[in-house]
Amino acid sequence: MIPTTERVFQIFKELNQIPRPSHHEERVSDYLCNFAERLNLSYKRDKENCVVIRKPAAPGYEKAEPIVLLNHMDMVCVGMSNPQTTPIEAYVEDGWMKARGTSLGADNGIGLSMALAVLESKEIVHGPMEVITTTNEEDGMSGASQLGPDFLKGRKVINLDSEDYDTITTGAAGACLQFHRIPVEFKPAPEGLWFCVRFAGGLGGHSGVDINKGRCSAVKASCYFLNALRRKCSFDVASIRMGEANASIASSAEVVFCVPADASGIVEDVERLTNKWIRENFGVADPGMCCGVSPCEVQEMVANADSLAALISCLEQVPQGVLKMSETMADTVETSNNIGRVMTEDGCIFVSTHTRSFIDQDMDALSRRIADIFASCGAKSETVMSAPAWQEDQHSAFLQLTSDCFLDVLGWRPRMVAMHFVLEAGFFVEHFPGIQIASIGPRIVEPHSTSERVELSTIEDIWHVLIELLRRLAVPE
C-alpha cells in the first residue's frame, strides 16, 4: 500500500522543531544522518554539512537508472526572536498550513519531508536512489557550489523546491549576492533629542518570486525618511537595522537618531511626509507598511557624518525591484535587484544586495555597477555568491515524462516555466555533466515572510505525482 502524506506531515513537524537558519544547519544535518542510520542506509556528509543518503532499488528494479531527489535543509527565518533556538508553531486553517508569527519553513521543508518519507517507505517502487540535501541555499548556496564530483552518481534529478504547484520549473535566473561595507567611525553623541524611526507592517516577501509585486522596501522607505530629514535639519545616527534576510524584500527597519533640541516638530513633519510617500507609491500593493517615530533612550556614540552621507547616497543610487522584463518569456522578470539588509557593525555599515537575471552577462554588468556605486563612496564590496542561470530543454524525454505523470495522476498538464529565482540546479549542471533536472512542488505562497503558507491539497497531489514518476523511471537502462 502506498503511504499517505500523513508521514510527510509528521516528518515536517519534526524538522520544524529543529531551528535551521542558513549557516547554522549542524543540528538538522545531524537529524538527516541519524535518519539514515535508523534505516540502515548509507550516507555521506561533507564539510559544508550537505548530506546524501543512498537507498537501494526496490526488489526487481536494481538495473534501473539512479534517481536523485534534491532539497535544501536551511530556511529563511522571519519573525523569530532567536532563529537558532526558536521552533516553529504550525497550524492548519482553511486548507492551508501556516505558522504563528514566523515563517513556516515549507520552503524547502515540505519537499525534504517528502524525500525522507520515500526513503522510509518499503512500498514505493523506485530504482537506485540518492536523496541529497544541501546547506545555505537561502543565503549564498555555498553547499551546492562546493559539491565534489563524486558526491552524486545519478543524472536525473527531481528537485522538490518549486513553489508553483501547477508548473514544472525548467529554468531559473542566475543570482549574485554581494556584501558591501562602508567604513565608519563612531564619535561621542552630541546633546539633543533622541528618536527611533521604525518601519513595519510591510508584506516583504521573496526577492525573486515577489519582486514584481510592487511592494515597499523598508530600506528605500528609510532612505526617503533620512533624505527628507537632512534637508530640514542636522542629525546624527547611532544605529541602523534594516531588513531581515538577504533573500527577502525588507519589510521592517529601525534607525536610532538624534536631532537638535528645537527640531522635534521637524521630525514629526518628516514622519507625516514619509507616510504620505508610502501611501502614494505603495498604498495598493503594500497597504500595511507605515513609518512611526517615537522618543528613545540617549545613546553614547554616533556615526560620523561622512559615512552616513555615503550610505544615503548609495541607497539612493542602487536600484530596487524590476529592471527589465523578458522579451522572450511572457510575464517573466528578466533582471532585478534587491537591497536585503543594512546595519551598523563594528567599523562599518553593512549592506547586502541580491541581483538576479536570466542573462548572465546582464547580471554581471549590474553587479559591477552596484559595486562601483559603493566604491565611489569608499566602500569595499565582496561577491559572496554567484550562481549561473539554468535552462532545461523543455522537449526532453525526462520533462515530458514528468508532465505525463501530472496528466495521468491529476488529469491536467502543468506549465513548463523558467522562474525569477535562483535554484541550485545551475551548480548541479556545472558540477555533474549530463545531468537533467525537473523541479516540482506544492503551492507555497509568500515564502520568506510571516505570511508563508502551503496548500495542503497540493502536497497530496505532488506526493502522488512523485510516486508515479519514480515508478515510471524505475525501468532498466
Give a label for each model feature.
Residues E93-K98, T102, E137-D139, A144-R356:
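Midchain, well-structured core segments that form catalytic/ion-binding scaffolds
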Residues I2-W96:
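Acidic/His- and Gly-rich active-site-bordering loop/insert found
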Residues E327-F350, H354, L410-E468:
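Zn-dependent metallopeptidase/amidohydrolase metal-coordination segment
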Residues T332-M419:
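Substrate-recognition/cap regions that form aromatic- and gly/pro-loop-enriched pockets
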Residues Y61-R155, E191-W194, L308, E316-P319, ...:
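Active-site metal-coordination/substrate-binding segment of hydrolases
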Residues M73-M75, I132-G140, D161-Y165, L203, ...:
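Acidic, glycine-rich active-site loops and adjacent beta-strand->loop/helix elements
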Residues S217-V219, Y224-I240, E392-I435:
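Active-site-adjacent substrate-binding region
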Residues R215-K232, A261-A263, D306-E316, K324-E327, ...:
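His/Asp/Glu-rich mid-to-C-terminal helical/loop segments that flank catalytic regions of hydrolases
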